[in-house]
Amino acid sequence: MRAGLAAAGVAVALWTAAAAAQDLEPRAYSNAPVGLNFLVAGYGHTRGEVAFDTAVPIEDASLTVHSAFLAYARAIDVWGRGGKIEVVLPYAWLSGTAAVNGVQTERDVSGFGDPRVRVSVLFYGGPALSMAEFQDYRADLIIGASLGVSIPLGQYDASKLANIGTHRWAVKPELGISKTLGPWTVELATSATFYTVNDDFFGGRVLKRDPLFAAQAHAIYHTRFGLWAALDATYYMGGRTTIDGEPGERGENVRVGATLAIPVTRHHSVKLYGSIGAVARTGGSFDTAGIAW
């Protein structure tokens, strides 16, 4: 087996974890009229250097990831409270180079990622409203929670490290709060992502990962024309990886970014987003930019 598989395999795992647990997503706890459907298609580009922990013999990893996703969401009534159910199907193409055990290698891989399902409920300040009732609704203080699940159905080959899927479940409970102040909305959220064991890792190894804890903040400015812009930041820590009992380093990273949503028609809008690594203890420094319709 070529050593170059290691660089791509662990890198894809990093990308999948980032997508699931380090999202910079503003307006996650905004209300919507019951029955409203959302269909979103998007593309993202990630590029940068990745620093792996001591459990993995990889150095000088430089990666480029092209990712696409298709997402569907529906606003629902949860015992009189506003809520949403969301389904995301990702696909990724990754290419990169790295030194594995001192040998310079390169790798290309592509495939479907693990699909994700998320259910959210607004416990306070977000009642379930019809389309007509929603016309008179004004957001103030909203408190909500969500539960996200990553389902291990993505591309995975146990004979190789280069996989898009992770071959393990991930569960992410989150608590969020938002406060509207005139044209501004401030949103805060904290979460923990828990992982099951991958007992079919490359070479018959067992891969475990500690919970990953995250906190994110958004300052969102709304205009009367439907356009909105946000400044985003997230801090996450934990997520230590252990392979066959050999622990790596605990992660501690900060990312900052911005989002701009531009209405095109009454029912369509374009969202532009980007983020950079501000502080990276492990996981590397990489930049991400994308567009969604």
Where do the language-model regions lie?
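Transmembrane beta-strands of outer-membrane beta-barrel proteins
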Residues: 37-39, 83-87, 117, 141-147, ...
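Residue-level signature of outer-membrane beta-barrel architecture
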Residues: 43-45, 74-76, 121-123, 149, ...
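Repeated loop/turn-to-beta-strand initiation elements of outer-membrane beta-barrel proteins
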Residues: 49-50, 80-83, 127, 183-186, ...
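Surface-exposed strand-loop-strand hairpins of Gram-negative outer-membrane beta-barrel proteins
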Residues: 46-67, 104-105, 158-165
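Outer-membrane pore/translocation modules
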Residues: 92-209, 247-249
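Outer-membrane beta-barrel biogenesis signature
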Residues: 15-40, 48, 125-141
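Hydrophobic, lipid-facing positions within transmembrane beta-strands of outer-membrane proteins
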Residues: 37-39, 66-70, 113-117, 143, ...
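Outer membrane beta-barrel transmembrane domains
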Residues: 202-293
